[in-house]
Amino acid sequence: FPRYPALAPAVAFWTDVFGRQSEHTSVVHVARTPQIVLARLHFDAGLPAAQRREQERAALSQMQQRLERLHDDLVAGASLDAESKALLARFGTTANPQMVKAAATDLRTQRGVRERTAHAMEVSGHFLPMMEATFERHALPVALTRLPFIESSFNLEAYSKVGAAGLWQFMPATARHYMRLDEAVDDRRDPWMATDGAARHLADDYALLKDWPLAITAYNHGRNGIRRGLEKTGGKNLLDLIERYDNPRFGSASRNFYA
C-alpha cells in the first residue's frame, strides 16, 4: 500500500495511540490534523466512565477558550505569555491566527488503546491463519487481515454504539449483502463468515475505486460515499479527499482510517 509522506504525521499519531498511549490517558488534539496534540489527560484506573467523559468535555471546553484567546491576542499583536507561546508552538513553525481559530472549533479527545492492542496481539493468532487463507483465496493483500486490530481489537463481542458488530464491525445494512443477518442468525459474530464477507466487501470496494487507499477508506465510509466525494471535489486519490472534501459524514474516523 502507498505510504503518503503527507500522512506520516497522522500515522505517527495513531501509532502512539495504539502502541504507547495507555487506556488511562486521553489527548486533546485537532481533528483534521491529529498530530497537533494540545493537552494530555491522565485518569485514575478506577475512575467511572461518566466522570472521565465529564473531564474530557471540560478539557475540550477549556482548550477551545484558550485557543480563542490566543487567536485574539495574535490578531491584536499582543505579547504572549509563556503558556500561550507554548500552546502556539504546538502548531509548528507555520502557525498563524487562522489556523488557531479553525482549531478552536475542531477539537476532539482520543483515548489510548495500548492495553487493548496488546490483548489483540495475543488473541489474533487464533484467527489470522484462517483470515490470511481467506484473503489469499480472494486474491487480496493479506495485510488487510490486520484491519480488525483497528475495528474491534479482535474482540468477538465488539458492538459499537451505532450498531456495528463482530471482528470486522459490519453495520446491519452492509452485512445483509455479504452474510446472513436476521432474527435467527447474525453471521457478524461468526469469525469465518464475517471474514469471508469482509474479503468480498473489500474486493467490491477495490473493483469500484481501483485504488487501495480509497478502497480501505470505503470500508469505513462506504464506497458510494467515497465516489460522491471524488465527484464533488474532482479528486483522484485519498489525499485529494482529505484536503478538499468538506462533508460532516466524512469525519475524523473516515479521514484517518487509512493512516
Model segments located where?
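An acidic, Gly/Ser/Thr/Pro-rich helix-cap/linker signature
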Residues: 1-138
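Extracytoplasmic
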Residues: 82-88, 102-104, 139-145, 149, ...
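Substrate-binding clefts and substrate-entry loops adjacent to catalytic sites
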Residues: 107-118, 154-164, 168-214, 234-248
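Solvent-exposed, polar/charged alpha-helical surfaces in well-ordered, non-transmembrane soluble domains
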Residues: 129, 133, 145, 196-203, ...
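Short, functionally critical alpha-helical segments immediately adjacent to catalytic or ligand/cofactor-binding
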Residues: 141-157, 215-220
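Short helix/loop segments within enzyme catalytic domains
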Residues: 206, 210-223, 227-229
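Generic recognition of short, well-ordered alpha-helical interface segments
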Residues: 252-256
